[in-house]
Amino acid sequence: IVGSYTYVYDYAGVLTDETMEHIDAMNASLFAQTGAQILVSVVNSTGGADIMDYASDLGNSYGVGSAERNNGVVMLLALDNISQSGLMGDYCVVVGTGLESHADDFMSLQSYYLENDFAAGEYDAGVKATFDAFIAWFADFYGVTNREGYIPAVRETYSSGSGYYYTETHGYVAPALGSLVS
């Protein structure tokens, strides 16, 4: 449904529909293949809460990522928060416990792809570039193909030789719909 987003919440109104649709479509493909999800949230303020705690709470309340793998990621921008450096605006990324050993990768990607656009007020461009870098990281990490609309078809087939069912996966292009509940 256009205008109804599952993986992105823009309470500040700075992201384009195109970017939000892209985030949803790519997340649906990522989730179908790996159970991983990237929640993107843009708020005006965290209401005085620590930005990392706020992001962690978002991830936990939405159930981001696979419960078995704990491979969810939350990218949060708080436009009116005061950063640790004293500047207006702050952002962070938090990862599930299954990705904790890779947290530095995500922080480095966010710093590299978001910082300049964030400082210039180009939030949409920065979010999209950072999100795409996260998607590329996951694709490499799990060895999967990730593109809009690509959701692998999973089919159970009965083997008369062994008497067991086995799973076959074939790629196909389909409308991408996702869910944050795994």
Q: Where in this protein do the model-derived segments appear?
A:
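Folded, non-transmembrane soluble domains that reside on the lumenal/extracytoplasmic side of membranes
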Residues: 1-180
